[in-house]
A protein has these predicted regions:
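Short acidic/glycine-rich loop or secondary-structure boundary segments that cap or lie
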Residues: 154-155, 182-186, 238-242, 254-256
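N-terminal Rossmann-like NAD(P) cofactor-binding subdomain of oxidoreductases
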Residues: 1-199, 204-206, 298-302, 337, ...
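Short Gly/Pro-enriched turn/cap motifs at secondary-structure boundaries
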Residues: 203-207, 235, 283-287
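Alpha-helical scaffold segments in soluble metabolic enzymes
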Residues: 18, 22, 157-161, 214-218, ...
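Oxyanion-binding "anion nests"
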Residues: 208-231, 235, 239, 243-245
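Generic secondary-structure signature for well-ordered alpha-helical cores
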Residues: 25-28, 164-168, 209, 220-224, ...
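C-terminal active-site/capping subdomain that shapes the small-molecule cofactor and substrate pocket
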Residues: 244-344
């Protein structure tokens, strides 16, 4: 099978670097171009010593002419920038976006949550918000693939099967997520320069974090009822990983064992989702440097409630790994291609 030519735009951010680490191990991918802005002319090894002995192109500035011989473009850019690139795609070029440009199905929602007008409205309907385990099977019908955010990934994977089977109530859901500071990007060091980033736990986006929008959009596909949930993210003094704790009310006569069995049956043929035994305690250490999601269902002191724990690596399953997983589905590559763990 010939290799696909890939272009990565936004090569030097935490997600971009992680993506390149995965792609250099992907036997069906040739990294033809790496693009950046302030990093033009530099080597990617300047940003991670892992690349010191890797043969990779120097970072250049993106221009639309680079797309001529490219099969797949990965965009790991600030929100809004992939929209401009999407307008110049060739007929046979796939765009996989790791930001939020094509996550929301309505341009009005994008304006509401991201405070900017969508500059490629006509392409929204040609894009797919692809959470691989849920709707990845539809990916072949789309040229633009939007990867879910890191927090929504950790929340939607345990909740969607339960919504789909009407096992939990759609009201009074509490989603409490804690992430390593890499989730805030390299700029987090500037933002916290006068504070001790490594000794502080802080909530942010309380009540209105942008990821509320895609969580609600996706969950609504699996219920006709009105949703009622609160989602609060936190930055923690660790580099990578997300642990989400989700509190839900059970429907009548639904038990903890029923919840676990449903999740197990839903994901039993999946390579990356692991449903643990009842009341298992999990940590981010269980999943960092992998494309896995660990899910545990725990009892509450109230019989009509359960507590769900969900752990992922925000840079892999919540970012670059999910992009590669979508790539593999789109081009019918073995699902684990580029997602092996001997590289870190």
């Amino acid at each position: 099978m010939p290799k696909l030519n890939a272009l990565v735009v936004g090569s030097t951010g935490y997600i971009g670097v992680q993506l390149i680490k995965l792609l250099v191990k992907h036997k069906y991918i040739n990294i033809k171009y790496l693009c950046g802005n302030s990093s033009v002319g530099k080597k990617i090894s300047n940003y991670d010593k892992y690349f010191l002995n890797k043969k990779l192109p120097k970072i250049i500035k993106f221009n639309k002419n680079l797309l001529k011989n490219i099969d797949v473009v990965f965009t790991a850019l600030p929100n809004g920038e992939a929209q401009d690139i999407s307008k110049h795609l060739n007929k046979n070029t796939t765009l996989i976006d790791l930001a939020a440009d094509f996550r929301l199905e309505k341009s009005s929602d994008y304006l509401k949550w991201y405070k900017q007008k969508h500059r490629a409205k006509n392409l929204i309907k040609k894009s797919l918000y692809s959470l691989p385990e849920i709707n990845g099977k539809d990916i072949n019908n789309y040229q633009i693939i939007s990867c879910p955010g890191c927090y929504p990934t950790s929340i939607l994977l345990p909740l969607i099967p339960l919504f789909k089977n009407n096992l939990i109530k759609v009201k009074n859901i509490v989603m409490d997520s804690k992430s390593g500071y890499s989730g805030a990007g390299r700029g987090v060091h500037i933002k916290f320069k006068d504070k001790n980033l490594y000794e502080s736990l802080s909530a942010y986006g309380v009540g209105y974090h942008r990821h509320n929008s895609e969580i609600e959009q996706m969950l609504k596909k699996f219920t006709k009822k009105n949703l009622d949930f609160n989602f609060t993210p936190h930055l923690t003094p660790m580099f990578r990983g997300i642990l989400s704790t989700i509190y839900v009310d059970l429907e009548k006569d639904v038990t903890q064992s029923k919840i676990i069995k449903t999740l197990y049956n839903f994901y039993k043929k999946n390579h990356f989702i692991k449903i643990l035994k009842a009341d298992s305690l999990i940590s981010t250490n269980d999943v960092i440097n992998t494309n896995n999601c660990f899910i545990s269902v725990c009892k509450s002191k109230y019989k009509n409630k359960i507590i769900i724990l969900s752990a992922i690596d925000n840079l892999i399953k919540g970012g670059a790994g999910q992009a590669v997983q979508n790539l593999n589905i789109k081009f019918n590559f073995p699902i684990k291609s580029g997602l092996l763990w001997d590289m870190f």
